[in-house]
Every structure is written in C-alpha cells, then in structure tokens.
Amino acid sequence: MNTFLPQKWMRLLFVLPVLNFTFGCTQKFNDVSATVQEAYGNYIDVELTPEEIESVPYASAYLKIGSQKQVFVVLAFAESNPLTGQTQLKWVSADKAMVVTENGHIVKTIGLQTTNLAGVYGDVPAYSHSSAQYVLSYDWSEQYRYGFQAHVERSHQGKEILTTPISSTETEVYTEVVTFPSLEESVENTYWVDSDGQVVKTRQHLGPTMVPVELTILKGYSKS
C-alpha cells in the first residue's frame, strides 16, 4: 500500500502553475515529475484511499500499460489544441512519463515503457448511440513511422457502472475498431463515457500489435 504524504502536495500548488510547460523543456518536465514523486512514496502499483485522492489538489487518474502494475498520474497542464479546438490534457507520472488526451483519446505519449505515440490527427465526432466512421492519421516515434492512415468504426455497446475509490458513475460504453489498411492490421479500443459526454475510462492500443494503455479518471478536470 502506498504511503501518502498529503502535505507534500502543497508544493505542487506553487510548482505546477508557474511552469509554462512545453515538451522541449526537459528541466521543467523533470521538476514536475520529481514533485509528484515526492508527494507519495510508492508510485508503482499504487492504490490510494478516497481521502488520499481527495487530498490531491489536481485532477488525477490511474494509468496501466498492458499487464504492468498501475501508476498514479496527475493532470499537470490543460491546453487548447489549435488544430481541433479541443482541450488537451497532459497527465504526468512520477517516473517522467506523460500521456496526452483529447476527451479520452490518447493523442501523444512520452516515456512509456512501450512504443510511444508521436501523434494522432483527425476529427473525432461526439459520442452518440449512432454508429460513426471517421479517419485518423497515426505517427509513432519509434523508427520514425509517420502518416499511417487509420479507418475507425465506432459503435455503442450499452451501459455500465464504472466504480472508482471516490465515485460510481453510470456510463455509456463504446468500442471502436481501428483499421490500418497499409499495415493490414486492426485494433479495438473501448471508451466509457459519462452523461456529460466526457470519457472517464479508456482502454486503447497505440497501434497494431501494441499492448493496450488503460486510463481511469479518479478526479476529473474542470475548467472552473
């Protein structure tokens, strides 16, 4: 069980807002990760109590890669994507990994112990019970693989109650089949969406033959 040090989070109140983070600024990235790590002891396979989660003054989530143990991540930055107009959420772990999402869709990763996603581009329609088809473009940083077109078919699967240590939420479950014609491969992703249309849990493959990445929101992001 993780040994949590709530008072350490007070340092985050001063560190995170002034960092003006960019991906190219390694020192600032390290500062965020180090501060998060100092806030609690064992950040791998962590299971926080409801009180510990509520003590964190930022949005937070559990991140799990394949069969690896889950880690705790916090929302360090929320920035508008000028290409889509969507808010990009940048989740940071204590071991210097980052996952970037746009309403639950993982669009970039840094420092994961798997093939990292350099970018996903394209317009994703809002969630509805009607089926949807759209096209995305995938870039992977490993071996500089860029511009792989993907055809996506999304369908509604029904309702499911999603339970975390601090909430129980009725969700609509959607699956999407992502097909890469040039690779003759496909993957299936799953999204749990609340009544406000926000993704509160996702299980996604970053590409063909890659292990799934699972992100479960504990405390959600709010613009207010």
Specify the residue positions occupied by each region the protein language model found:
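Bacterial N-terminal signal peptides that target proteins for export
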Residues: 2-14
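Acidic, serine/threonine-rich low-complexity disordered tracts
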Residues: 26-101, 105-111, 133-224
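Acidic/charged, solvent-exposed loop-and-adjacent secondary-structure segments enriched in E/D, K/R, S/T
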Residues: 118
